[in-house]
Amino acid sequence: MNKDLKGLYAALLVPFDENGQVNEQGLKQIAQNTIETEELDGLYVNGSSGENFLLNTEQKKQVFKVAKEAVGDKVKLIAQVGSLDLNEAIELGKYATEIGYDALSAVTPFYYPFTFEEIRDYYFDIIEATQNNMIIYAIPDLTGVNISIEQFSELFNHEKIVGVKYTAPNFFLLERIRKAFPDKLILSGFDEMLVQATISGVDGAIGSTYNVNGRRARKIFDLARQGQIQEAYQLQHDSNDIIETVLSMGIYPTLKEILRHRGIDAGLPKRPFKPFNEAHRQTLDQLIAKYDL
C-alpha cells in the first residue's frame, strides 16, 4: 500500500435539495463534521450511504470534488467508483485519482449473474486504467455476489488490490481471509458488528452511522483491540440500540435529521427515498437526548 489506509471511515452521507441536486454547502458541512466532531480517520465517498446508485456521472464527480475540497489532506479518502457501466467506473476512477483520492473501491457488479472471471476482469480493467489501489467492496446481501476464499486469493494476487470492505455476516469467511492474507487491508462494513469484526482482526471499519456515532465507534474499536471485550460490548449494545431505532425510521432521512439537529444543512434524501416522517419526531428527539447524538 502506498498509504496506511487502516482506521475508521464515515460512509459519507450526501444532502440533496427538493430537485435531487447535490447541496454542496451541506455536503462540506457533513464532511467536516466527521473530522471535527466524530474524529474519524477518513471518508468513504459515493458508497451506498451517499445514495450513489441514484446519481448520474456528473453528480458523482461533483460529490468527489466537494468532499475533497472540504477535507483536503486532513484525512484519508476512498472513492467508491463501482458501476454496472464499466466505462463509467473507469471514468470515475480516473477522476478521483486525478484529484487526490488515496484509493479506489468498487462494489462487485450486480443484478446480472456475472461469472467470477467477469467480476475479476472488471476490477483488473479499472486498475489498469487508473493505476490506483483498489479495495473490493463485498456486500453479498445487496449484490447477490459471494466471493469464496479461493476467489479472494485470485483477486489479492494483483498487487494493486490492497484489501476488501467486508459487509457480510459470515465471520467464518472473515477469519479465513484474515488468516490467509495477513497483509491485506480488511475494513468492516457492518456498524452493528464492530466488536465481532474487531475481534476477528479487521484493520478498521466503514459505517453510515459513523456520520453521527463515530466517537462511540472509536471507543468500541479501541477497547476491543485492547482486549476489553465486555466494555466494548456495552458500547456496542448502545450503538445497536441507536442503529435499530434509526433503521425503523428510515436510515438516510433519520441520519440527516440528526445532523440537522446539530445545525448542519443535511438536506433531503434523493427520490424515490422519502423525507423524514414527522410522526417519528418524538422518538428521534428521545434518541438524540439519550445517546448524546
Curated annotation (Swiss-Prot):
One Pfam family from the record: DHDPS
Binding-site residues, aceneuramate: 48-49, 167, 189, 191-192, 208
Keywords associated with the record: Carbohydrate metabolism, Cytoplasm, Lyase, Schiff base
Recorded GO MF terms: N-acetylneuraminate lyase activity
Catalytic activity: aceneuramate = aldehydo-N-acetyl-D-mannosamine + pyruvate
Single Gene Ontology BP annotation: carbohydrate metabolic process
Residues of the signal peptide: none
Enzyme class: lyase
This protein's pathway: Amino-sugar metabolism; N-acetylneuraminate degradation; D-fructose 6-phosphate from N-acetylneuraminate: step 1/5
One Gene Ontology CC term in the entry: cytosol
EC id: 4.1.3.3
Catalytic residues of the enzyme: 137, 165
Function: Catalyzes the reversible aldol cleavage of N-acetylneuraminic acid (sialic acid; Neu5Ac) to form pyruvate and N-acetylmannosamine (ManNAc) via a Schiff base intermediate.
Similarity section: Belongs to the DapA family. NanA subfamily.
Assembly notes: Homotetramer.
Name of the molecule in the record: N-acetylneuraminate lyase
Organism per entry: Staphylococcus aureus (strain bovine RF122 / ET3-1)
Species classification: Bacteria, Bacillati, Bacillota, Bacilli, Bacillales
